[in-house]
Amino acid sequence: MEQKVDIKENYIYELDDKLLEILLKDHSSNKNIIWATDNYSFRGKGYYPHDHIALKSITGRNGLVIKPRVKKSKKEQNKRIKDKAEVFTPSWICNIQNNSLNESWFERKNVFNKEIDETWEVNKDKITYPEGKTWQDYVKLKILEISCGEAPYLVSRYDTVSGEWLELNNRIGALDRKIRVVNENVDNEKDWHDWVIEAYKATFGYEWQGDSLLIARENLLFTFIDYYVDRFENYPIKEYLEEIAKILSWNIWQMDGLKYVIPDSCKPEPKMQLSFFEDDNAPQECPGCKKNNNSQHTGIYCKVMNWKTNRSIKFYRGEKKMKFDFVIGNPPYQDSTLGDNDGYAPPVYHKFMDE
């Protein structure tokens, strides 16, 4: 179970030396993702919050640097809670929330499982669909996990709080459910591959911290491996793995979810000198941060892929943001940028929902 929960970067590198390079890619900056946490700063150069995560920093003798939350020390867990309000949700709560989304779409309860206290009983019958809806429609639903951490709402290889390993037939993630639907409705490898690719292209998540983001991408990649091996009793070819990794490098991206830019990428602007006597070196605060205007940030705005056109687009375009059929995430997630929020902060889920 140790290897299953904590995916070793050295193992991925040995599997295919291109995979980690793809999984580390940040398409918004056209560089690698950044650490965006000071938890690794004690290691020195290459591990500071604004440093890009290099392959050599997490492989070879550094192959054990990145660990899932459940494998981190309590001290480190508490520090991340304090610094970035990092919250991980047990699988049974993720299941309740995912069930709620499915109840809305299927127009009935207990579609994939029945909740029983802090666990669930799997519905083993083939899933049926409401009139006018098909299994293909379900697979294509665009689902976003906000502030996704290790992506427990999307895939549930293990409980991110307890570390308990979940067998395939007991998984509750949104992508797990889509792959189950594909399994129930196709009978050959080509169709299975094509529809699972559609499922991945419709599954999204963003995260601030680089280590958690990489783990999320790894979890989604190995979810593909888990289901492929179970279905075809063989390991997927490298081309399949690289295809999935490339999708994940776009769909699971690094972002400040309140500003829609790469974390901490906003920089002060040079002040315009109005007179000879003014200090022309005094910088001005990022206008977007100062005015709480998301169209005026000096940071690097994040890009996502429009898979219908195979062209990248900015996630935030003026007052328009990419929309999704369902948005899921930790219940406390709120917008803390509006006024005095000591007692109340408005939720942000609706900002991403399809209208």
Which residue stretches match the model-derived regions?
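SAM-dependent methyltransferase catalytic region
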Residues: 2-355
